[in-house]
């Protein structure tokens, strides 16, 4: 098991060189969107995704989309297919962006398509990772350096070409907080473009690099058109280490990073992959909820549990890490979802709080 802080230090000079940032090539990874195939300029390095994608949801009016009936799990989750278990697979970005920009008058469909930039380089080595290992390793054959200005030009071109709104720019990875300068520079460019929302993913491991640019980063993170999703890996230190390949002692660093985001007035959301090892699922989830509550009493209500699909790259990672004795857990993910949403959260929160979208939950 490795030290992810040392790994981040090694990766940083490869991810940021001469004022340009290393961006993963999406083409050829199986992650590109089919419809984009003829838009080579974008789909080679950037990708687009719809977050509300079910036809019956896309046809709803904004008021209908804000109904609490769309929250939580479908009835009988344990006998449903995993793919369909959540009524809404993702609230972020469409709902979070709409809410931050226009409150509940906002239309989530205006923020449903995200122009996604994937930085190459991650200091974890997760066994479920959706990114192909070579794409995530600062490998020059699978990535290219771009200035922020060049990236924003691609975004503007995409906005002109698509006949539906693209108002969200998502920065994912890799771990982008190893080079937080990217987020700062990108926001400063996006600020000049009306109506954009910046969504930042992080694995909550790179506080040192965040603190090095504290003032500029804080200034970006507190803006209304910025949201951050911190992805916790596992509900306890043992599971964290099996999932990420990092030493168990770094489990607590995730909470320190989340605290830093909260202290800096970030609109913070949490992802939790539905991966729990062993039989004590409820006990582990309960313990994790308590750890989040110690940071902020409402933080568990801002969690979106992630379905771990066997996408082509994820399948390769699962097979590779299985050989390193880090297979993904055998626990049925539906059981993890059921425990989180139907058993543990109702133990701590009222019906009224449970019927809020994550973005409505005050921190
Ligand atoms: S899942 Fe995220 S944190 Fe984990 S290795 Fe992949 S990019 Fe890094």
Where are these regions (language model features)?
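Cysteine-centered iron-sulfur cluster-binding motifs in ferredoxin-type domains/subunits
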Residues: 116-129, 144, 175
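N-terminal [4Fe-4S]-dependent radical SAM core
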Residues: 19-118, 133-137
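Short N-terminal secondary-structure initiator segments
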Residues: 57-76, 166-185, 206-208, 212, ...
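Short, conserved acidic/polar surface loops in the N-terminal third of protein domains
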Residues: 127-130, 138-142, 181-183, 210-212
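Conserved alpha-helical substructure of the radical SAM core
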Residues: 133-169
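Conserved AdoMet/S-adenosylmethionine-binding subsite of the radical SAM
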Residues: 155-168, 173-303
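Short loop/turn segments at strand-loop or loop-helix junctions that form parts
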Residues: 118-120, 128-132, 230-236
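Auxiliary Fe-S-binding modules of radical SAM enzymes
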Residues: 1-60, 256-363
């Amino acid at each position: 098991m490795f030290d992810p802080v040392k790994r981040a230090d090694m990766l940083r000079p490869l991810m940021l060189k001469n004022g340009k940032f290393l961006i993963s090539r999406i083409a050829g990874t199986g992650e590109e969107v089919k419809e984009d195939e003829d838009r080579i300029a974008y789909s080679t390095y950037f990708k687009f995704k719809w977050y509300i994608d079910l036809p019956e949801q896309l046809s709803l009016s904004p008021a209908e989309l804000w109904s609490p009936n769309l929250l939580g799990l479908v009835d009988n989750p344990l006998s449903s297919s995993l793919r369909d278990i959540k009524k809404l697979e993702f609230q972020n970005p469409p709902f979070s962006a709409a809410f931050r920009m226009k409150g509940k008058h906002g239309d989530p469909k205006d923020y449903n398509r995200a122009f996604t930039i994937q930085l190459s380089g991650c200091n974890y080595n997760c066994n479920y990772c959706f990114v192909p290992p070579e794409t995530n390793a600062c490998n020059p054959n699978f990535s290219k350096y771009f200035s922020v200005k060049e990236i924003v030009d691609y975004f503007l071109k995409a906005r002109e070409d698509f006949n539906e709104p693209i108002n969200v720019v998502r920065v994912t990875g890799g771990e982008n907080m190893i080079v937080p300068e990217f987020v700062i520079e990108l926001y400063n460019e996006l600020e000049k473009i009306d109506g954009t929302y910046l969504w930042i993913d992080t694995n909550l491991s790179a506080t040192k690099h965040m603190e090095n640019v504290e003032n500029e980063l804080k200034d970006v993170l507190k803006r209304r058109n910025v949201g951050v999703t911190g992805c916790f890996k596992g509900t306890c230190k043992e599971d964290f280490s099996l999932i990420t390949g990092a030493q168990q002692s770094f489990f607590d660093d995730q909470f320190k990073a989340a605290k830093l985001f909260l202290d800096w007035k970030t609109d913070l959301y949490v992802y939790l992959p539905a991966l729990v090892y062993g039989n004590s699922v409820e006990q582990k989830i309960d313990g994790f909820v308590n750890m989040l509550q110690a940071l902020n009493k409402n933080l568990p209500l801002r969690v979106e549990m992630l379905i771990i699909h066997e996408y082509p790259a994820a399948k390769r990672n699962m097979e590779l890490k299985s050989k390193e004795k880090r297979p993904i857990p055998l626990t049925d993910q539906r059981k993890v979802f059921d425990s989180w949403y139907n058993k543990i959260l109702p133990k701590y929160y009222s019906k009224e709080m449970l019927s809020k979208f994550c973005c409505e939950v005050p921190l």
